[in-house]
Amino acid sequence: MNKKQHIIEIATELFNQYGYHVVGVDLIIKEAGVSKKTMYRYFQSKANLIIEVLQQRQILCATSLKQKIQHEVDNFKKLELVFEWHDEWFNSTTFTGCLFAKAATEFPNKSEEAHQIAMQQKSSLMAVIEQLLPHTHKHLAPILIMLLDGATLSAQVLGDKKAAIKAWKTAQNLILK
């Protein structure tokens, strides 16, 4: 792994665990075992590093979700797999909440690039869900996103490891109604 990617991975872990504003460049440098010169060779600022972290995480999550659902032919089952993907994430040892939700919270100005990436991630996930819903139920996509967001918070804040499963049961009730 090259140094730039190593810095990104360390920063991702730190931002995920502590948030964006709390983690300083000095901590990233220390944990990554690199010099300030090396850090700034790859990233002009902490803001640039945050953007890179979010962009890579967006690609990673989208790719992982796509791989999870790609072999299933039934859209309803694919939708269930979206919730299953979240269940697996919530129950992983590295789960500490959503980097995109943290970005939207810590960078509340919608013109900030970190906030825009968070909005793009949410829009992309909504597009996936909308695509999987029957034409007559496309209006439910934002509601299913809310269920997933609520499940994410329940898993993070309350430690509810079954939050995604509960959200799927509610989603099923809405879709099959």
Model-derived regions: residue spans:
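Amphipathic alpha-helical segments used for helix-helix packing
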Residues: 90-116
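Helix-turn-helix
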Residues: 6, 10, 14-48
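Hydrophobic/aromatic-rich alpha-helical bundle segments in the mid-to-C-terminal region
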Residues: 114-119, 135-175
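Hydrophobic alpha-helical connector segments
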Residues: 52, 66-92, 141-144
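Generic hydrophobic, amphipathic alpha-helix propensity
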Residues: 3-11, 28, 53-57, 61
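Short, solvent-exposed amphipathic helices
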Residues: 67, 113-128
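Hydrophobic/aromatic residues within well-ordered alpha-helical segments
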Residues: 46, 53, 57-61, 75, ...
